[in-house]
Amino acid sequence: MKNPIKFLFSSEESDTKVANNRLLSYAIGLAGQNMNYNFVSQRLFVFLNAVMGIKPEKTGWITSVSTLWDAVNDPIIGTLIDSRKFKPGRKLRPFLLYLPPLIGVLTALMFFDFGMNETQTIVMVVAVYLMVDIFYSVQDVALWGMLPLSSPHSEERARVSQWVAIGAGAGASIAGLFPTIKDMIINSGLATEKNAYFIGAAVFGFGGMIISMLAYRMKEKVYTQAEERESVLKTLSTLRYNKTLIIICLARLLGGITLTLPWEYFFESQGISYHVFGLELTGGTMQVLYGLIPGIPGAFAMFFAAKFANRIGGMKKVLVISEIGQILIRTVAFFLGSNDRFLNGGILISIMVLISIMNIPINMKDIAHRSLISDSIDEVELKTGERTEGISFSMQNFISKLTSAESKFIQGYLLKFLKFDNNVKRPAGKNPIGYQTGRFLKYRWHQFMLGPVVGSILYLIVILFLDDDREHMAEVERQLKLKREAEQPQEEAFEMIEAES
């Protein structure tokens, strides 16, 4: 058995193989970035609505409009990155070093209570969000765009995709600890709820961005350079040659149409406490456990995603299996926990076991998306002579943020439909989630367990049209290798990249 320490810190590399120590730094960098992203995406809506007291529909508009701007900004940034002049090995790496500290500071400011009224708070949050978005978009496109540049070979890129997905998932899980940390801070009297959110933003937002700087150690191993600026419109027009990217983007966009709320609105509703193995757990603690424990099998399975995909016949089948599994398992879990049976410890554990099984292929989805898109960039290069890391991965970011925006928009009106009252009578200093009645409580389990099924059905319909032919991809690699060798010998190209790095 290999020594895991030697394996992770191995510096062995070639023109096609990524050194494990660089891959580890890249994965940790993605973990840091996802700490920031997940804290903001999961907590900003709740912070503005339940903590700062902004009305649900206004909160929905703030977060959805801000995220829409964020989404539209990404393709512009990606196109500009692809069309600019750069030297070999320096297309994306510089952005990974200089932008994170600024992004981290701006993130923390979004969660600071300046003591302003509702209108002033809305203006401040939107203004800061728009500023942070520009810098975040550049860094985000550069981080993920490094994946197709990591190696000219599909199998090695799949390995890189697998490890960075593990890093990203780890970062999201770390950020998911916030509810428990928040409860501990508040219950110990160390800070108010507002200040607890600011502490979270400082730790996960700013701290995560500092950690993300480690990704700068990754190298660009696919020889590419632009001695002259390309037309922005020409760069953007290459998207029409990328059928894989278009199908994945459409599937993800439709998959974001879910009738569900952030987890806090379920786990903290009506001051619920959960009785498990004789222990009484708070809603915040149960939320962390529900995210952490069922996520363990899926996190472990990510280490074998590439092998699993090869065994079943490709990454497309991973995507299909993940959605069918989610539809079936969520439906079974809904009936198992209906009529408030989810409050029973034994029932809840059974549901968590089902969700654990569901999460195994679900956690492989992002690996499959990125692996397929990295391969599609090679296909576009063969057709057009242009490499499109910037625009291709900015489109993925665009869709991520567009789906987030549509989700936030739906959440605002779903709260209104459920008659959520953020002025409900409650003890001083307590957020209103735990004191709701009526329709909100009646449908809390429906929205939590069945809401995501709507998006899964829509996603599955579209993804069935995706092509994933391994023999065709091998031929693309062969032709590209001949093309690159004709333009510049691979050894010489690699030496240039090494020197520039």
Question: Which stretches of residues belong to each language-model region?
Answer:
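Membrane-embedded alpha-helical bundles of multi-pass transporters/translocases
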Residues: 2-500
